[in-house]
């Protein structure tokens, strides 16, 4: 809150260990920054993560939120490693999802009229970011998000070659594409490119997004490492379990496996 409101920054990085409460922290930040009445865009890389976040924010919000889900239908989209499906289908979401711009425009207007004093939260995958941009244009210039929360923000780094179209993950940085007053980038694993790589990118007119670029990501205003989270009893320390086997037991297992293979061969012969 101090970073965004009192210092007036429009971008910032929140670095917290996995499981230490990034989602809950972002909810409280959004509520505090907008007095619980803002327009929030929450971006995630998969439908499964969208589902988790939707349920978490709905359950933990101080006041009831008005959620809208935007993501592609996995039944009609091609299955690629870059798709937004994860392990959950659109049909399993707690709220109906759509990528239809007109439906989104209508939903936003309905939600705002029904709950004018509540927080409107658009949950979306990065892959559907162009749909959000088109919906913003359809609604009008007055519809600007108060805050964009970029979860798994290390996914928004990368290289764009000259003449190529930016990926959906990278386009979130552009305020001319998606209009917002503030941007929160949160991750447990910030991705940084070496100085020499950044210099080479400049020489070759390559657009490089690295999380140490404060123009894109803002300053790091809070960090909670795994070790610190354990000290604060937010996480349990991990234990290393090493399994050992002596040679006697190893030989016994090998003999049993050989006997099983022999029995299988005899069975095959008998079946013939």
PLM regions and their residue ranges:
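Pre-Walker A adenine-sensing motif
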Residues: 1-6
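Pre-Walker A (Motif I) flank of P-loop NTPase domains
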Residues: 7-13, 38, 120
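Walker A/P-loop
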Residues: 8-29
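Conserved Walker A/P-loop ATP-binding site and its immediately adjacent core
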Residues: 34-62, 66-81, 126-128
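Conserved helicase motor
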Residues: 69-79, 93-102, 125-131, 155-156
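Conserved helix/coil segment N-terminal to the catalytic DExD/H
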Residues: 104-144
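SF2 helicase catalytic motif II
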Residues: 127-128, 138-185, 189-191
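Interdomain helical connector at the RecA1-RecA2 junction of SF1/SF2 helicase-like NTPases
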Residues: 195-272
């Amino acid at each position: 809150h101090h970073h965004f409101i009192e210092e007036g920054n429009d971008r910032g990085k929140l670095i917290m260990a996995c499981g230490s409460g990034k989602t809950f922290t972002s909810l409280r930040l959004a509520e505090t920054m907008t007095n619980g009445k803002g327009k929030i865009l929450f971006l995630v890389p998969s439908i499964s993560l969208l589902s988790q976040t939707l349920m978490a924010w709905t359950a933990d919000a101080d006041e009831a939120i008005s959620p809208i889900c935007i993501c592609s239908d996995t039944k009609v989209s091609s299955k690629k490693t870059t798709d937004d499906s994860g392990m959950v289908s659109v049909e399993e979401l707690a709220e109906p999802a759509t990528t239809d711009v007109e439906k989104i425009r209508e939903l936003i207007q309905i939600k705002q009229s029904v709950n004018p004093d509540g927080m409107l939260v658009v949950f979306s995958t990065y892959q559907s970011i162009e749909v959000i941009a088109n919906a913003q244009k359809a609604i009008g210039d007055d519809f600007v998000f108060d805050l964009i929360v970029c979860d798994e923000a290390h996914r928004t780094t990368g290289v764009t070659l000259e003449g190529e179209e930016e990926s959906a993950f990278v386009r979130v940085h552009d305020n001319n594409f998606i209009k917002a007053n503030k941007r929160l980038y949160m991750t447990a694993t910030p991705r940084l490119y070496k100085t020499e790589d950044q210099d080479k990118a400049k020489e070759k007119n390559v657009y490089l997004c690295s999380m140490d670029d404060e123009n894109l990501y803002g300053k790091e205003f809070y960090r909670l490492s795994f070790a610190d989270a354990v000290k604060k009893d937010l996480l349990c320390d991990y234990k290393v379990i090493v399994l050992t086997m002596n040679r006697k037991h190893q030989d016994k297992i090998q003999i049993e496996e050989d006997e099983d293979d022999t029995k299988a061969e005899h069975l095959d012969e008998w079946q013939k």
